[in-house]
Protein backbone atom coordinates (compact mmCIF):
# COMPACT_ATOMS: atom_id res chain seq x y z
CA UNK A 1 0.00 0.00 0.00
CA UNK A 2 1.32 3.46 -0.89
CA UNK A 3 1.89 6.02 1.82
CA UNK A 4 -0.26 9.17 1.44
CA UNK A 5 1.56 11.88 -0.50
CA UNK A 6 0.59 14.56 2.03
CA UNK A 7 -0.17 14.00 5.70
CA UNK A 8 -1.65 16.75 7.90
CA UNK A 9 -0.34 15.85 11.37
CA UNK A 10 -1.30 18.90 13.42
CA UNK A 11 -3.67 21.87 13.13
CA UNK A 12 -3.74 25.15 15.09
CA UNK A 13 -6.24 27.99 14.87
CA UNK A 14 -5.83 31.75 15.33
CA UNK A 15 -2.05 31.76 15.60
CA UNK A 16 -0.96 35.19 16.85
CA UNK A 17 1.57 36.03 14.11
CA UNK A 18 -1.02 35.75 11.28
CA UNK A 19 -4.12 37.77 10.41
CA UNK A 20 -7.06 36.23 12.27
CA UNK A 21 -9.05 34.14 11.92
CA UNK A 22 -6.54 31.62 10.59
CA UNK A 23 -5.64 27.96 10.40
CA UNK A 24 -2.09 26.58 10.39
CA UNK A 25 -1.53 22.99 9.29
CA UNK A 26 1.68 21.00 9.79
CA UNK A 27 1.98 18.91 6.63
CA UNK A 28 4.51 16.08 6.33
CA UNK A 29 5.38 15.36 2.70
CA UNK A 30 8.39 15.05 0.43
CA UNK A 31 6.75 17.47 -2.00
CA UNK A 32 7.57 21.17 -2.13
CA UNK A 33 4.97 23.80 -1.33
CA UNK A 34 4.07 26.16 -4.22
CA UNK A 35 7.12 28.42 -4.66
CA UNK A 36 5.06 31.53 -5.42
CA UNK A 37 3.30 31.19 -2.04
CA UNK A 38 6.42 30.31 -0.02
CA UNK A 39 8.44 33.19 1.44
CA UNK A 40 10.33 31.39 4.24
CA UNK A 41 12.32 28.15 4.48
CA UNK A 42 13.75 26.08 7.33
CA UNK A 43 16.38 23.35 7.76
CA UNK A 44 16.61 20.52 10.30
CA UNK A 45 20.29 19.47 10.42
CA UNK A 46 20.47 15.76 11.35
CA UNK A 47 23.64 14.32 12.93
CA UNK A 48 24.94 10.77 12.37
CA UNK A 49 24.32 9.98 16.05
CA UNK A 50 20.58 10.67 15.75
CA UNK A 51 20.62 14.18 17.17
CA UNK A 52 19.27 17.27 15.46
CA UNK A 53 20.76 20.76 15.69
CA UNK A 54 18.28 23.39 16.86
CA UNK A 55 18.76 27.17 16.76
CA UNK A 56 18.34 29.18 19.96
CA UNK A 57 16.63 32.44 19.05
CA UNK A 58 17.27 35.23 21.57
CA UNK A 59 13.54 36.16 21.69
CA UNK A 60 11.68 32.95 20.83
CA UNK A 61 13.89 30.24 22.32
CA UNK A 62 14.44 26.90 20.57
CA UNK A 63 13.40 26.82 16.94
CA UNK A 64 14.26 25.20 13.64
CA UNK A 65 16.80 27.34 11.78
CA UNK A 66 15.20 29.30 8.97
CA UNK A 67 14.11 32.59 7.56
CA UNK A 68 13.17 34.60 4.50
CA UNK A 69 13.93 33.46 0.98
CA UNK A 70 15.98 36.12 -0.81
CA UNK A 71 15.09 37.18 -4.38
CA UNK A 72 17.94 35.17 -5.93
CA UNK A 73 17.40 31.99 -3.85
CA UNK A 74 15.35 28.84 -3.98
CA UNK A 75 13.68 27.66 -0.78
CA UNK A 76 16.40 25.01 -0.42
CA UNK A 77 19.15 27.62 -0.87
CA UNK A 78 17.58 29.83 1.82
CA UNK A 79 17.19 26.93 4.26
CA UNK A 80 20.83 25.92 3.71
CA UNK A 81 22.01 29.52 4.27
CA UNK A 82 19.85 30.05 7.35
CA UNK A 83 21.04 26.78 8.92
CA UNK A 84 24.62 27.97 8.60
CA UNK A 85 23.84 31.49 9.87
CA UNK A 86 21.80 30.32 12.88
CA UNK A 87 23.58 27.08 13.84
CA UNK A 88 26.97 27.01 12.09
CA UNK A 89 26.07 23.77 10.30
CA UNK A 90 26.58 22.78 6.70
CA UNK A 91 24.44 19.94 5.39
CA UNK A 92 24.18 17.64 2.39
CA UNK A 93 21.64 15.13 1.09
CA UNK A 94 18.91 17.73 1.57
CA UNK A 95 15.31 16.54 1.26
CA UNK A 96 11.97 18.31 1.70
CA UNK A 97 10.11 17.01 4.76
CA UNK A 98 7.00 19.17 4.76
CA UNK A 99 5.57 22.61 5.23
CA UNK A 100 3.29 24.81 7.26
CA UNK A 101 0.17 25.68 5.29
CA UNK A 102 -1.27 28.92 6.64
CA UNK A 103 -4.74 30.07 5.65
CA UNK A 104 -6.38 33.28 6.84
CA UNK A 105 -10.05 34.07 6.47
CA UNK A 106 -9.64 37.68 7.60
CA UNK A 107 -11.73 40.24 5.70
CA UNK A 108 -8.75 41.63 3.82
CA UNK A 109 -4.99 41.93 3.66
CA UNK A 110 -3.76 43.84 6.72
CA UNK A 111 -1.80 47.01 5.97
CA UNK A 112 1.91 46.24 5.70
CA UNK A 113 1.40 42.46 5.58
CA UNK A 114 4.28 41.14 3.46
CA UNK A 115 3.24 37.55 2.85
CA UNK A 116 0.94 35.88 0.33
CA UNK A 117 -2.69 36.23 1.39
CA UNK A 118 -4.97 34.43 2.18
CA UNK A 119 -2.78 31.31 1.66
CA UNK A 120 0.95 31.04 2.34
CA UNK A 121 3.53 28.39 3.17
CA UNK A 122 6.72 27.84 5.15
CA UNK A 123 8.89 25.10 3.61
CA UNK A 124 10.90 22.65 5.77
CA UNK A 125 13.91 20.56 4.75
CA UNK A 126 16.24 18.08 6.44
CA UNK A 127 19.87 17.39 5.67
CA UNK A 128 22.80 15.34 6.95
CA UNK A 129 25.28 17.41 8.95
CA UNK A 130 28.65 17.60 7.21
CA UNK A 131 30.30 20.16 9.47
CA UNK A 132 29.56 22.31 12.51
CA UNK A 133 31.53 25.55 12.79
CA UNK A 134 32.17 27.18 16.17
CA UNK A 135 29.24 29.51 16.81
CA UNK A 136 29.48 33.06 18.14
CA UNK A 137 26.36 34.43 19.80
CA UNK A 138 24.82 37.42 18.04
CA UNK A 139 21.77 39.66 18.39
CA UNK A 140 19.53 37.00 16.78
CA UNK A 141 20.77 33.64 18.09
CA UNK A 142 22.77 32.02 20.89
CA UNK A 143 24.82 28.86 20.41
CA UNK A 144 22.67 26.05 18.98
CA UNK A 145 21.78 22.90 20.92
CA UNK A 146 21.73 19.26 19.90
CA UNK A 147 18.48 17.48 20.73
CA UNK A 148 18.22 13.70 20.90
CA UNK A 149 14.72 13.39 22.34
CA UNK A 150 11.88 15.06 20.46
CA UNK A 151 9.99 15.15 23.79
CA UNK A 152 12.74 17.33 25.35
CA UNK A 153 11.10 19.84 27.72
CA UNK A 154 12.96 22.72 26.11
CA UNK A 155 10.91 22.21 22.94
CA UNK A 156 7.82 24.38 23.35
CA UNK A 157 6.32 24.17 19.85
CA UNK A 158 4.65 21.06 18.49
CA UNK A 159 5.93 21.83 14.97
CA UNK A 160 9.55 21.39 16.14
CA UNK A 161 8.78 17.90 17.40
CA UNK A 162 6.84 16.95 14.26
CA UNK A 163 9.39 18.26 11.76
CA UNK A 164 12.25 16.90 13.92
CA UNK A 165 10.75 13.40 13.79
CA UNK A 166 10.12 13.73 10.03
CA UNK A 167 13.75 14.79 9.54
CA UNK A 168 15.09 11.81 11.47
CA UNK A 169 12.96 9.41 9.41
CA UNK A 170 14.01 11.05 6.14
CA UNK A 171 17.75 11.34 6.72
CA UNK A 172 18.85 8.47 8.96
Predicted regions and their residues:
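A short coil-to-beta-strand element that immediately follows conserved catalytic motifs
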Residues: 90-100
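Short acidic (Asp/Glu) patches
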Residues: 27-29, 75, 80, 102-113
Amino acid sequence: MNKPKEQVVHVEHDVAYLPTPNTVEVVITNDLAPAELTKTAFMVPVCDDGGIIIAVNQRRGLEIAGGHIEADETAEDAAFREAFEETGTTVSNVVPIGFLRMTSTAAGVPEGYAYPFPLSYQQFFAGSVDNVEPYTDNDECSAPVKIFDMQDRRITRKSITLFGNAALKSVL
